[in-house]
């Protein structure tokens, strides 16, 4: 399904994104479960318990540094930086980070956190900016760039990738850590309601790119943008403990919300349950590449 079939315009997509991240359900959920961080944690396959969650989050950020494979002092762009937790982790480990986001309270909180960290002035810079419109960032100005569960919000992922490619220096590294859909016509026939729920999640969270993704989608984006040395990793098993936890915790309240017919107004709750039930309908991918 193309982005235009989910959202009538880029403006509509951005309204959905802002509505989601400004909702109390979203803000309280991220704060209570992840301490404000907006990405999954990384676990050893076979792990059952998701606790302690904060250690798994930092482990994912450590893994990201490995996937970027850049030396200390590198200038890195984070597209969709949220409240700045990933940017801060990288900055505290010697990277110089430019974080961009379109949500006002994200930008404000990220800037406050950066100030409290007492890092050198240019170690971390947070800007309010749409990562599909990076014209204010000079070409060939960054050694690396990445998205951490944010590229799914793009109205045009192709436009976003072209921008990332432009701002990277020759030899610059790019990494994305994203949910990739796995369309299955047979599964859709067996459980059409689940298919509808998964699309409802993408609409409610403002994720047109996630809705149109499919097996190999992100790898294809990097190839089309001009990246080389592309590698793909499926790390779905590494996030399973927290996906399972969401299902266990949210199932009963979700059933109540569903009974009332108001599930579209509780999209985070829907994502926490349908995401686990439909675990075979998506995978969690890391795709990396280099600008030649």
Curated annotation (Swiss-Prot):
The entry lists its GO molecular-function terms as: cyclase activity; polyketide synthase activity; sterol 24-C-methyltransferase activity
Q: Which Pfam families match?
A: Methyltransf_11 (PF08241)
What Gene Ontology cellular-component terms does the record carry? endoplasmic reticulum; membrane
Q: Which UniProt key words apply to this protein?
A: Membrane, Transferase, Transmembrane, Transmembrane helix
Q: What are the transmembrane regions?
A: 240-262
This enzyme catalyses: 3-[(2E,4E,8S,10E,12Z)-4,8-dimethyltetradeca-2,4,10,12-tetraenoyl]-4-hydroxy-5-(4-hydroxyphenyl)-1,2-dihydropyridin-2-one = 8-epi-ilicicolin H
| Gene3D superfamilies with a match to the protein in the record | Vaccinia Virus protein VP39 (3.40.50.150)
Q: Which top class of enzyme applies to this chain?
A: transferase
State its role: S-adenosyl-l-methionine-dependent Diels-Alderase; part of the gene cluster that mediates the biosynthesis of ilicicolin H, a 4-hydroxy-2-pyridonealkaloid that has potent and broad antifungal activities by inhibiting the mitochondrial respiration chain. IccD catalyzes the Diels-Alder reaction that converts the acyclic 2-pyridone intermediate to 8-epi-ilicicolin H. The biosynthesis of ilicicolin H starts with formation of the tetramic acid by the hybrid PKS-NRPS synthetase iccA with the partnering trans-enoyl reductase iccB since iccA lacks a designated enoylreductase (ER) domain.
Q: This protein is called what? A: S-adenosyl-L-methionine-dependent Diels-Alderase iccD
Organism lineage reads as:
Eukaryota, Fungi, Dikarya, Ascomycota, Pezizomycotina
Name of the encoding gene:
iccD
């Amino acid at each position: 399904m193309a982005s235009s079939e989910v959202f009538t315009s880029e403006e509509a997509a951005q309204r959905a994104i802002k509505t989601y991240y400004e909702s109390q359900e979203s803000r309280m959920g991220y704060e209570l479960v992840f301490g404000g961080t907006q990405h999954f944690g990384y676990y050893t396959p076979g792990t059952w318990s998701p606790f302690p969650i904060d250690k798994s989050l930092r482990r994912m950020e450590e893994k990201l540094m490995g996937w970027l494979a850049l030396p200390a002092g590198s200038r890195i762009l984070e597209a969709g930086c949220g409240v700045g937790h990933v940017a801060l982790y990288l900055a505290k480990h010697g990277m110089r980070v430019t974080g961009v986001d379109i949500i006002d309270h994200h930008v404000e909180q990220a800037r406050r956190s950066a100030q409290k960290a007492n890092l050198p002035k240019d170690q971390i810079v947070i800007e309010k900016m749409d990562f599909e419109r990076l014209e204010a960032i000079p070409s060939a100005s960054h050694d690396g760039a990445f998205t951490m569960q944010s590229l799914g919000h793009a109205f045009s992922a192709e436009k976003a990738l072209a921008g990332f490619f432009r701002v990277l220096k020759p030899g610059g590294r790019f990494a994305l850590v994203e949910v990739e859909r796995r369309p299955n016509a047979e599964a859709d026939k067996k459980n059409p309601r689940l298919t509808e729920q998964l699309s409802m999640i993408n609409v409610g969270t403002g994720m047109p790119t996630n809705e149109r993704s499919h097996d190999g989608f992100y790898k294809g984006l990097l190839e089309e943008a001009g990246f080389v040395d592309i590698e793909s990793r499926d790390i779905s098993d590494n996030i399973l403990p927290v996906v399972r936890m969401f299902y266990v915790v949210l199932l009963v309240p979700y059933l109540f919300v569903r009974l009332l017919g108001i599930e579209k107004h509780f999209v985070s709750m829907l994502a926490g349950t349908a995401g686990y039930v439909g675990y075979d309908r998506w995978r969690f991918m890391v795709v990396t590449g280099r600008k030649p």
